[in-house]
Amino acid sequence: MTQFLIVVATVLVMELTAYSVHRWIMHGPLGWGWHKSHHEEHDHALEKNDLYGVVFAVLATILFTVGAYWWPVLWWIALGMTVYGLIYFILHDGLVHQRWPFRYIPRRGYFRRLYQAHRLHHAVEGRDHCVSFGFIYAPPVDKLKQDLKRSGVLRPQDERPS
């Protein structure tokens, strides 16, 4: 039971970590060089932004190794990071950005809100004034629209994400 709680707690901490990294590193001067590719149109399967996933995968691999040989709790933390990575891949890369071989656009509920919130995140050109930096949690869409309108960066065609 303790190991399960470690995994669940790690998934929750990873959402906070991902929010922070996305907001202040990826959209900051330090990380925009990689993340910019994610905000630009392209016709290739991979983006420079995917290197962030490699960084977290390497970190999880190190934790798996150290946990297996020296400190077992790190193994369970690495498993939580891996579970979060899988959730991220399904929700962000798959559902929101359609990086899988079929197209599915959610029509209602949690997945719709997540989809719309991330569309609004991409409604801004450049790295400033974006909204909704989390990947599992998305603020209410109406609040995000208000924030974008207040900042003056929301284009009319982006007011109703599809």
Swiss-Prot record:
Coiled coil spans: none
Pathway: Carotenoid biosynthesis; astaxanthin biosynthesis
EC number(s) recorded for this UniProt protein: 1.14.15.24
Secretion signal span: none
Positions of the Fatty acid hydroxylase domain: 8-135
InterPro entries linked to this entry: BETA-OHASE-like, Fatty_acid_hydroxylase
Domain of life: Bacteria
Catalytic activity reported: all-trans-beta-carotene + 4 reduced [2Fe-2S]-[ferredoxin] + 2 O2 + 4 H(+) = all-trans-zeaxanthin + 4 oxidized [2Fe-2S]-[ferredoxin] + 2 H2O
A GO biological-process term: xanthophyll biosynthetic process
GO molecular function ontology, one term from the record: iron ion binding
Family to which the UniProt record says this protein belongs: Belongs to the sterol desaturase family.
Protein known as: Beta-carotene hydroxylase
The species this protein was found in: Paracoccus sp. (strain PC1) (Alcaligenes sp. (strain PC1))
Taxonomic lineage of the native organism: Bacteria, Pseudomonadati, Pseudomonadota, Alphaproteobacteria, Rhodobacterales
Name of the coding gene: crtZ
